[in-house]
């Protein structure tokens, strides 16, 4: 790895800034991380991630953690799934091995949007319990059913960041203050 590899992919002013600083890769990465933290600002006091385990596989846990940890130091997550959904059992291991993750398994038979509705109810409850200007919510899903609650959060003054798959539609992506894409590789 060359000391200038960090500049690969940068264009325009960003490339000019990177080359003129004389900073190493590590220093430039730290500068970028601090800039990201400024985006969060006061919203970083209460940070919550709501993960829809039905459409985001547990294999993305490391990327989700990296994305959120680049922006804030302290955060908590809730992972939602149906109790008998074996496809989401990978999230059970994630919750067991991470103190900041709470697993919520919904009982009963499958019903249309059961998990989505529970996540939305919990997010709405959060709005009443936190100071909106000090709160940041990450919604980890590719399901556009969350667009309405994203709008409600933004109107209340909450910073809302989406994390989802590349297949997420443009309207859903644009409803967030920022959208981070999960991709294989």
Where in this protein do the model-derived segments appear?
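Domain-level signal for Mg2+-assisted phosphodiester chemistry and nucleotide/NA-binding surfaces
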Residues: 3-125, 152-155, 159, 166-167
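Small/polar loops that bind or transfer phosphate-bearing groups
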Residues: 52, 138-142, 164
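Extracytoplasmic/secreted cell-surface and envelope-processing proteins
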Residues: 59-60, 146-149, 171
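Acidic beta-strand-to-loop metal/phosphate-binding motif
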Residues: 80, 135-142, 149, 153
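Short, internal active-site loops enriched in acidic
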Residues: 85, 143-145
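Glycine-rich phosphate-binding loop signature in dinucleotide/nucleotide-binding domains
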Residues: 129-134
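VWA/integrin I-like adhesion module and closely mimicked acidic/polar interface patches used
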Residues: 150-182
């Amino acid at each position: 790895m060359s000391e200038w590899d960090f500049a690969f992919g940068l264009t325009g002013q960003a490339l000019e800034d990177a080359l003129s600083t004389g900073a190493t890769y590590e220093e430039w990465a730290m500068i970028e991380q601090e800039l990201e933290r400024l985006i969060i600002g006061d919203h970083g006091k209460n940070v919550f991630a709501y993960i829809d385990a039905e459409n985001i596989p547990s294999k993305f846990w490391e990327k989700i953690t990296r994305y959120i940890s680049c922006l804030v130091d302290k955060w908590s997550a809730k992972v939602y799934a149906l109790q008998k959904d074996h496809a989401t059992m990978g999230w059970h291991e994630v919750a067991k091995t991470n103190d900041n993750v709470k697993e919520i398994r919904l009982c009963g038979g499958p019903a249309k949007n059961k998990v989505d509705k529970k996540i939305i109810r919990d997010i709405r409850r959060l709005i009443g319990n936190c100071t909106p200007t000090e709160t940041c919510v990450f919604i980890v899903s590719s399901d556009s059913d969350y667009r309405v609650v994203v709008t409600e959060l933004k109107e209340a003054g909450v910073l809302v960041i989406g994390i989802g798959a590349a297949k997420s539609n443009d309207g859903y992506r644009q409803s967030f203050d920022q959208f981070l894409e999960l991709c294989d590789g």
